[in-house]
Amino acid sequence: MISDSQIFVALLFALVSAVLAIRLGTDLYQ
């Protein structure tokens, strides 16, 4: 059983990792 807090944490973690991946990608691209 997945609770709402676990879904919120998973979404927040995915958002942070996506932002870090984009920033790292742009740094390597330039």
UniProtKB/Swiss-Prot annotation:
Signal peptide: none annotated. GO terms for cellular component: chloroplast thylakoid membrane; photosystem I. It is a single-pass membrane protein. GO terms for biological process: photosynthesis. It comes from the Eukaryota. The chain crosses the membrane at residues 7-26. Keywords: Chloroplast, Membrane, Photosynthesis, Photosystem I, Plastid, Thylakoid, Transmembrane, Transmembrane helix. InterPro entries: PSI_PsaM (IPR010010), PSI_PsaM_sf (IPR037279). The keyword Transmembrane applies. It is found in: Plastid, Chloroplast thylakoid membrane. Its main location: plastid. Belongs to the PsaM family. This is Photosystem I reaction center subunit XII.
